[in-house]
Design a protein with these regions (language model features):
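Acidic, polar ligand-binding/catalytic clefts
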Residues: 11-46, 129
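An extracytoplasmic/periplasmic, membrane-proximal ligand-sensing/linker region
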Residues: 108, 115, 125-143, 150-156, ...
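Short, flexible turn/loop "capping" segments at secondary-structure junctions
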Residues: 44-45, 63-65, 177-182
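Bilobed "Venus flytrap"/periplasmic-binding protein-like clamshell domains
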Residues: 47-115, 213, 230, 234-239
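Short, small-residue-biased leader/transition segments that mark boundaries at the very start
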Residues: 1-3
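Pocket-lining segment of extracytoplasmic ligand-binding domains
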Residues: 18-20, 28-29, 58, 95-193
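Extracytoplasmic
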Residues: 8, 36-37, 47-49, 68, ...
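Ligand-binding clefts/hinges and TM-proximal coupling segments of bilobed small-molecule sensing domains
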Residues: 69-86, 160-232
Length: 250
């Protein structure tokens, strides 16, 4: 809805992840046969990170080990569930038949893990996730890892994803970084938004990044210039490009 409304001018600004934006501009995936390509990027805001948690007592170390088991994959058609589909498919499995999928949000999903109803919960968003933090605070829980072959296949097949890690100490009992993948969440604009307006919006945000991060630490990546102007799967708005060049970021 956000991308469709941004593209057709119903709204001038919107928020979306880079993977969904790529599908929109290329008329693929959920946007197949639709014309939703009139969007431009203003700036990335934060990253959504793939993460999954299980109880240490499960004996499971890798997401690949959950095949055939009961797994909470997020609400149906949510970002978490779409990424669960992608991950199991990249493993060569037939999703959702390869697991006993439970379509639960992060709170309910983590409760299901806590109660032994699901062996793991999959999430896709910033970290720490509240439900997963609660799970690690109340149970001896661990983050699941990727087998390197699976992770590298995901990165090779989907250029908008990037390798990253969840730092040690993010969750209670997590004593080492956990390698995973993520995607940038973008502020997008209707392609017909005036260059002047786009320029002024980007200028206002970029010149007040420190204040934004002080109010919400999840936005800390915005302080990294390379993160802000790094390669994106959709074009920057010309007004944004003008500001970034004037500021010496491009």
């Amino acid at each position: 809805m956000c991308i469709r409304d941004s593209s057709d001018g119903t709204v001038e600004l919107g928020l979306c992840t880079a993977d969904v934006a790529t599908q929109a501009v290329n008329s693929t995936g959920k946007f197949e046969g639709q014309n939703c390509n009139n969007i431009k990027a203003l700036f990335p805001i934060y990253s959504s990170i793939w993460q999954a948690m299980t109880l240490k007592s499960s004996g499971i170390e890798y997401i690949e080990d959950t095949v055939g088991q009961s797994v909470s994959v997020g609400m149906a058609a949510s970002a978490a569930e779409l990424c669960a589909n992608l991950v199991y498919t990249e493993m060569g499995e037939q999703y959702p038949d390869c697991i006993k999928a439970q379509y639960l949000g992060v709170g309910e999903g983590c409760d299901a893990v806590k109660d032994g109803i699901a062996v793991a919960h999959i999430s896709f968003g910033g970290y720490p996730q509240g439900g997963m933090l609660d799970l690690s605070n109340t149970k001896d829980a661990v983050l699941l890892k990727f087998q390197n072959a699976t992770l590298q296949k995901i990165l090779a097949d989907y250029s908008y994803y990037f390798e990253t890690s969840i730092p040690a100490g993010t969750y209670t009992g997590q004593d080492a970084d956990v390698t995973t993948y993520g995607v940038k969440c973008l502020c997008i604009a209707n392609g017909d938004l005036s260059d002047e307006m786009a320029y002024n919006i980007v200028k206002a945000v970029m010149e007040n990044r420190e204040d934004l991060v002080a109010g919400n630490s999840a936005l800390k990546e915005m302080l990294n210039d390379d993160y802000v102007v790094g390669e994106l799967p959709i074009e920057f708005h010309p007004g944004a490009v003008k500001y970034y060049k004037e500021a010496g970021l491009m």
